[in-house]
């Protein structure tokens, strides 16, 4: 099972390649590249550790008996599996604890930030749709049976009513999906606070018993007073771009990937930078002036550095985050090129090879373990 070790080693090679390639790409493409690389490599790491732990568990007598496996054959086929499992098992437990800690911390920070904001008006769009589960038979299209003329005979209407019910349910589903695909109006929350801060607060998904909430742009009165009118427009466009692009999902993926493999931690800072550059470019296009956007970024960062709002979550996007001088310099230059340099094609090919090899090695290791289990089950000494 040599293939199972490949996804654990390739991140040390792929991460520098991804960072090098991202520098030559436009901000949006760079953010997708870094987030995708982190996701693929973290998934391969998790699968490899799981396969190593599973291979060792299969050699435990109770597990072998439960799976009708020949324990002597398994021991001879993979003598080092228990040692690898003894290492992979605790590592998986630590990674699970880190993932829970990261998710819990993010949840508590977002909940505290939402609690500190004024109540947002409810989103009425879903109320215009038919209630899910309503019986369409209650909305009859024909006259009520009590109002029909006497002596008139009617065929059995149950098949027709079932067809109408299915058609209306299909229309309700299509309307719901259309609504979800439409851009959500992000609400603005202005806090009466002298401390200057502004950030994009992610919304909450709709769950049973709880209505969802759209994302909100949070800005303090201190931040608004620190900027001019055009600069305020650029700041709000920047934060709106974070919400529209779901940049909080990118940040969460990078944070969890860094918990799974130490080599993936260097991807967090460049991903945060390219997400801010992505929002900078959207804001510059929205206000139509790159210099105004650059001034807004610089002044917002200067104002927020004095006394930021204490309830701002750590894993949220903000206009004053990241290497601000570098972002301002990029905004004061022409629009970035959308084509990477020719000399970086080799870097792109090498990174693609690393990601493809990670995926192929994970699939091969999984198939290898499956073949081992099947062979152990068909051995003459396997319990029946």
Regions found by a protein language model. Give the residues of each.
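Membrane-interface helix-boundary signature
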Residues: 1, 27-30, 78-87, 340-350
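Cytosolic-facing loops and C-terminal tails of multi-pass membrane proteins
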Residues: 7, 11, 15-16, 88-105, ...
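Alpha-helical membrane segments of multi-pass proteins
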Residues: 7-10, 20, 37, 54, ...
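Membrane-embedded and juxtamembrane structural elements of multi-pass membrane proteins
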Residues: 25-32, 36-45, 114-346
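Transmembrane alpha-helices and immediately adjacent membrane-cytoplasm interface residues
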Residues: 44-47, 51-57, 70-114
């Amino acid at each position: 099972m040599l293939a199972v070790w490949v996804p654990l080693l390739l991140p040390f090679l792929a991460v520098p390649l991804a960072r090098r390639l991202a520098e030559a790409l436009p901000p949006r493409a760079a953010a997708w590249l870094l987030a995708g690389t982190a996701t693929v490599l973290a998934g391969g790491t998790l699968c490899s550790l799981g396969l190593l732990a599973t291979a060792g568990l299969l050699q435990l007598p109770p597990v072998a008996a439960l799976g009708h496996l020949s324990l002597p054959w398994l021991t001879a086929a993979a003598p080092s599996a228990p040692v690898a499992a003894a290492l992979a098992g605790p590592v998986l437990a630590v990674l699970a604890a880190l993932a829970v800690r990261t998710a819990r911390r993010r949840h508590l920070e977002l909940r505290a930030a939402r609690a500190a904001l004024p109540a947002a008006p409810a989103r009425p769009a879903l109320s215009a749709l038919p209630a899910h589960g309503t019986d369409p038979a209650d909305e009859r299209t024909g006259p009520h049976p009590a109002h029909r003329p006497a002596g008139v005979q009617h065929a059995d209407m149950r098949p027709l009513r079932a067809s109408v019910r299915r058609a209306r349910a299909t229309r309700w589903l299509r309307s719901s999906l259309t609504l979800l695909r439409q851009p959500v109006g992000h609400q603005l929350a202005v806090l009466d606070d002298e401390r200057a801060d502004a950030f994009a607060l992610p919304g909450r998904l709709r769950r049973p018993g709880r209505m969802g909430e759209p994302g909100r742009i949070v800005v303090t009165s201190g931040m608004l007073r620190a900027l001019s009118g055009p600069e305020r427009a650029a700041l709000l466009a920047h934060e709106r771009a974070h919400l529209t692009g779901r940049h909080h999902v990118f940040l969460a993926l990078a944070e969890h990937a860094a918990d799974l493999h130490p080599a993936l931690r260097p991807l967090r800072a460049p991903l945060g930078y390219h997400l801010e550059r992505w929002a900078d470019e959207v804001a510059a296009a929205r206000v139509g002036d790159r210099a105004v956007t650059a001034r807004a970024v610089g002044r917002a960062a200067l104002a927020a550095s004095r006394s930021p709002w204490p309830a701002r979550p750590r894993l949220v996007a903000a206009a004053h985050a990241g290497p601000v001088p570098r972002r301002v310099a990029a905004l004061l230059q022409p629009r970035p090129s959308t084509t990477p340099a020719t000399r970086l094609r080799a870097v792109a090919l090498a990174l693609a090879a690393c990601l493809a090899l990670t995926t192929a090695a994970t699939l091969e290791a999984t198939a290898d373990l499956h073949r081992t289990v099947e062979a152990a089950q068909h051995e003459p000494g396997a319990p029946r």
